[in-house]
Amino acid sequence: MITLTPGHLTLPQLRRIAREPVQLKLDPASFAKIDAGAKAVADIAAKGEPAYGINTGFGRLASTHIPHDQLELLQKNLVLSHAVGVGEPMARSSVRLLLALKLSSLGRGHSGIRREVMDALITLFNADVLPLIPVKGSVGASGDLAPLAHMSAVLLGVGEVFIRGERASALDGLRVAGLAPLTLQAKEGLALLNGTQASTALALDNMFAIEDLYRTALVAGALSVDAAAGSVKPFDARIHELRGHQGQIDAAASYRELLEGSPINQSHRDCDKVQDPYSLRCQPQVMGACLDQMRHAADVLLVEANAVSDNPLIFPDTGEVLSGGNFHAEPVAFAADNLALAAAEIGALAERRIALLIDATLSGLPPFLVKDGGVNSGFMIAHVTAAALASENKTLAHPASVDSLPTSANQEDHVSMATFAARKLADIADNTKHILAIELLAAAQGVDLRAPYHTSPKLAPVMETIRGKVAHYELDHYFAPDIAVIAKLVGERAFAKVAPFSFASEQ
C-alpha cells in the first residue's frame, strides 16, 4: 500500500505504482483542503456570478454563461464531447501512473472537486479496474483533454475499462468495483479533464524503461570492451574529474567497477595499441551526457507529477478563482524530448560497438564473429538490424516540442505536443532494447573467442545469463529467436541489475 500525499510524490513511489501491483490510499491530511476547495466552488456556483469553468462554456465559448440548472449537464457534456481519443489503449502501467498523478493534483485542494469523486478513482485503481484510454488525441494544452476525458467517462458509466486485464464496459467495471455512476457537480468535469497527467504518466513510464536500458547499456558496453580487447585506461577517474560533468564521472566509475579484475584486460595491457575507437574510449563522455539529460528530465517530471495543472485554480482562503496556464505541458514536452535524445544516443553508441566487434580489422576477432566466414555470415545481418533500429531512432528523436498547431478557434494558439513527445519514447526504448540485445550477443561471442581468457568477475554472471539462453554461435542458424530471448531478458532488467549504479527512482 502506498499513501499518496498530494504534492509529495517520490520517484520510487511512482516507479512502484507503474511496475508493481501496489494499492493506493490518500493521505487523510489532505481531506480538509479537498473539502475546502469543493465548498468554495459550490458557493461560487450558488451565487451565480460568472466564473470560468464553473458556470461558463469552455475554450472559445468561455464567455457563454450557463444557468445554474444546467451546471451538471455542462460537466457531463464536457466529458462526453471531449472523449475523442483514437489509437491503441494506453499501457496499463501508464494508466496506473495517470490515475495516481490525477489524484495527487486534485488532492491539493485547488481544483474544487468532491472527495466522493476522488474516492471513486481510488476504488477503481485498487480493484484493478482501469479505464481504457486511447493513446492518441492530445496536443498537451489545454492539458491532456481527450485522454483524461476517457478516464472521466468511466466514472459516468460510459466507455470501456480493463477489469484485471480483460476488456469490458465501464458499467461492468463500476459494478465489479462496487460503484455506481457519478453525477458530476460544478467544475468537476473540467477538474478531471484539465491537467498534464497523461503526458506526464507516459513520460515517467517510458523514463523508467529508459533508465533500465541505460544500466543495461553500461553492462553491454563494458562487455564489448573486453570482447574487443579494449583498454580500461580511458576510464581512469582523473580524466573525468578534470572535465567535471557528474554524469561522466559516474559513468566512468561504473565501467571501472564492471571491468575490474578482467583476465582478458590483463592479458593485453602491454600491447602496442595506443587508442581505442571512440565507441569504446568515449563511453563515459557519451553515456555521461545521456545520464545528465536523464537526471534533469527526472527532476522536471517529478515537479510536474506533484503539480496542480488544472485551470482555473481555486483558492479557498480568499474565494478567488484564477485562470492561468498550468495545463500547458511544455516542461513535460522538453523533458520527454531530452529523454528521446538520450535513449536514441544509447542505442546509437551500442550500434557502433556492434559494428566495431564484427570488423576484424578493428576488433582482431574473426570477421562477423564467426569461424569459417563465407559459408557462414555470422553477425553480419544482425548488425544491419541494429543499424536500421538506430537510424529509426534518429528520426523518432526529432523534438516534438518544436511543433505547435492552434486549436479551439485560435483561443488555444500554442500547444506543447507533450503527449506525442512522451508517447514516442516507447518506440525509441523498444528499438534500443533490441540494439542492446544484439550487442550483448555480439559481445558474448567476442568474449568466448578470447578464450582461454575470461571477462571480469562482475561481468561473468552476464555471460552465464546469456549462455543459459543462447549457445555460442558456431554455424549459421535461425537467428531471430536468439535476439528475441535476450531482448526479453533486457526488458526484465536481467542485465540492468548487474550495473553498479542506480537512479533516484530505484532508491
UniProtKB/Swiss-Prot annotation:
Under SUPFAM superfamilies, the record lists: L-aspartase-like
EC numbers on record? 4.3.1.3
Cross-link 5-imidazolinone (Ala-Gly) maps to 141-143
Mind telling me which Gene3D superfamilies this protein's record contains? Fumarase/aspartase (Central domain) (1.20.200.10), Fumarase/aspartase (N-terminal domain) (1.10.275.10)
Chain positions found as 2,3-didehydroalanine (Ser):
142
Q: What class of enzyme is it?
A: lyase
Q: Which family does it belong to?
A: Belongs to the PAL/histidase family.
Q: Which residues cross the membrane?
A: none
What species does this protein belong to? Burkholderia cenocepacia (strain HI2424)
What protein is this chain from?
Answer: Histidine ammonia-lyase
State the reactions this protein catalyses: L-histidine = trans-urocanate + NH4(+)
Recorded hits in HAMAP family, A to Z, give: His_ammonia_lyase
Q: Where is this protein chiefly located?
A: cytoplasm
Question: What are the alphabetically sorted keywords of the record?
Answer: Cytoplasm, Histidine metabolism, Lyase
**Example GO biological process term?**
L-histidine catabolic process to glutamate and formamide
* GO cellular component assignments: cytoplasm
